[in-house]
Structures are given as C-alpha cells and as structure tokens.
C-alpha cells in the first residue's frame, strides 16, 4: 500500500501566499519561499502552489519564485497557474517543479491534457477540479476561473463527468477542490469524495475543509483518498504536520513519518 500524502497548498497572488474562504476575500499569509521551506522541514510529503489569478488574467504562472522554491526544499512540488501550452509546462518543469497542474485551461481546451501527458508523462500531469455543490439541484458542478471571483463561471460540466473525461485524456492525478468547504474548516465533503472515488482510478487528492486532525483521518479512512491537501490549518499553525502524521499513524493510516 502506498503511503498517504499530506500536502500543504500555497495560493499565490502578486508574489505572496494568500488564503481566502470559499475562494473569496483573500488575506495575505506571507512570503512564498520561507513558507515552503517551513512546510518541508515540518514533514510535508509535497507542496502545491496555485498562482490563483494567472488563468483569469490571461498569463502564465510567475516563474521567478519556482526556481527559488526548488533550491530550498527537497520534496516534490506541483505548480499551477495559466499553463496553456507545452512550452509553458516545459519552462516550469525546467525551473525545478516536479509536476504541473492545469484547471481552467483544461476546461477551455481538453486536448491540452493529452498533449501534456504525451510529452511529459502522466506521472507529472495533475488536473485540478473546482467543484461546487448546488443545494437546489443536488448536483456538483465544475467552475472555471475561480481565482478571481468577478470572473468565476459555472461550466456545463458536472463534476463526475469531468472526472471521467480528464482521466480518458491522460490525467495522472486529480485534485478535487471542494469550493463549498474551502477555508471554513468544517471537514471535507465525504459524500462527494466517495462518489468521485468510485469513478476515479488515478490518485485522488482531497482539498477544501480540513479543520482538525480527525478530518484528515475521515478523508483517508472513509473516502480512500490518496492525499489530503490543506491550507489555512497549516498557515495559521492550527495543525502541526509532524503531529498530524503521528496521529494518523496511531490510527492505522499508512503514512510517512518525519
């Protein structure tokens, strides 16, 4: 059995790490490189960086900090933000990123997933999915351009259909960003995760809602996700990564101990 992964998420805007609630009202958390270094030292299994306004601004992720992060950490990291071409991806990987993640650009051009997978291998192609639960219809819908709330739009894709589509096109991993839970620390949406797990045959990462160590345990035990991503509980030092891993190990979760 592969070890489960604990993944801090760093949302980047204007060269700094920020955090919002339900993808809105972002506050500045701190500088990118020191935070990355801290999380690596605390025992994170990998890091994910989202340049949250790159796609909505029509630009690619700011590469200047990618190489600086690569210099100070010795764990894998993934970078996302406006990657719309093989050339964009090649540059980011050449600066030291281990994986690239695409989200809004994949919705605009699904063939991008296949082209990236063919060029670089499925192992480094992650597809992020921003999913919103509509209580009126009882359905999960995929949103696009979520880094800028004024430009966010609901797509025609229902979440489960898009999960299946991106796998057919070559996604090597899926990060499910559950927008309703984002930043509120009430726990992951286990019902949604279980439904996605049934149709997801590549590594699945849960994102949005972690507030306690028990929430991580529930995601691993009840929804069988491969990794759990979180931001505010780590940024605000509500949960220490090494203590979280010790707790999960004590509960029988296969985890890499620091």
UniProtKB/Swiss-Prot annotation:
Keywords: Amino-acid biosynthesis, Cytoplasm, Histidine biosynthesis, Lyase
Active site: 11, 130
One GO process term, biological-process aspect: L-histidine biosynthetic process
Subcellular location: Cytoplasm
Pathway(s) per entry: Amino-acid biosynthesis; L-histidine biosynthesis; L-histidine from 5-phospho-alpha-D-ribose 1-diphosphate: step 5/9
GO cellular component: cytoplasm
Catalytic activity: 5-[(5-phospho-1-deoxy-D-ribulos-1-ylimino)methylamino]-1-(5-phospho-beta-D-ribosyl)imidazole-4-carboxamide + L-glutamine = D-erythro-1-(imidazol-4-yl)glycerol 3-phosphate + 5-amino-1-(5-phospho-beta-D-ribosyl)imidazole-4-carboxamide + L-glutamate + H(+)
InterPro entries: Aldolase_TIM (IPR013785), His_biosynth (IPR006062), HisF (IPR004651), IGPS_HisA/HisF (IPR050064), RibuloseP-bd_barrel (IPR011060)
Domain of life: Bacteria
Pfam families: His_biosynth (PF00977)
Enzyme Commission designation: 4.3.2.10
Keyword flag Glycoprotein: no
GO MF entry, a single one: lyase activity
Quaternary structure, from the entry: Heterodimer of HisH and HisF.
Function: IGPS catalyzes the conversion of PRFAR and glutamine to IGP, AICAR and glutamate. The HisF subunit catalyzes the cyclization activity that produces IGP and AICAR from PRFAR using the ammonia provided by the HisH subunit.
Family under the similarity heading: Belongs to the HisA/HisF family.
The protein's name in its UniProt record: Imidazole glycerol phosphate synthase subunit HisF
High-level lineage: Bacteria, Pseudomonadati, Pseudomonadota, Gammaproteobacteria, Enterobacterales
């Amino acid at each position: 059995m592969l070890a489960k992964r604990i993944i801090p998420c760093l949302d980047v805007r204007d060269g700094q790490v920020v955090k919002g609630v339900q993808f809105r009202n972002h506050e500045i958390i701190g500088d990118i490189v020191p935070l990355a270094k801290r999380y690596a030292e605390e025992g994170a299994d990998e890091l994910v960086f989202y340049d949250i306004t790159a796609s909505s601004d029509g630009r690619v992720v700011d590469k200047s900090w990618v190489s600086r992060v690569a210099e100070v950490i010795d764990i894998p990291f993934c970078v996302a933000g406006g990657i719309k071409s093989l050339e964009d991806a090649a540059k980011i990987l050449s600066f030291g990123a281990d994986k690239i993640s695409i989200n809004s650009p994949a919705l605009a051009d699904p063939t991008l997933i296949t082209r990236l997978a063919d060029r670089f291998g499925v192992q480094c192609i992650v597809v992020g999915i921003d999913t919103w639960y509509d209580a009126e219809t009882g359905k999960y819908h995929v949103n696009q351009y979520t880094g800028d709330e004024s430009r966010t739009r609901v797509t025609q894709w229902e979440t489960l259909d898009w999960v299946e589509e991106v796998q057919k096109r070559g996604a090597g991993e899926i990060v499910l960003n559950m927008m309703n839970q984002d930043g509120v620390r009430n726990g992951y949406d286990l019902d949604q995760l279980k439904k996605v797990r049934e149709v997801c045959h590549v590594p699945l990462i849960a994102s949005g809602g972690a507030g306690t160590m028990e929430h991580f345990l529930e995601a691993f035990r009840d929804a069988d996700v491969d990794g759990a991503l979180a931001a505010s509980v780590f940024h605000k030092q509500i949960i220490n990564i090494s203590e979280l891993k010790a707790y999960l190990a004590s509960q029988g979760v296969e985890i890499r101990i620091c």
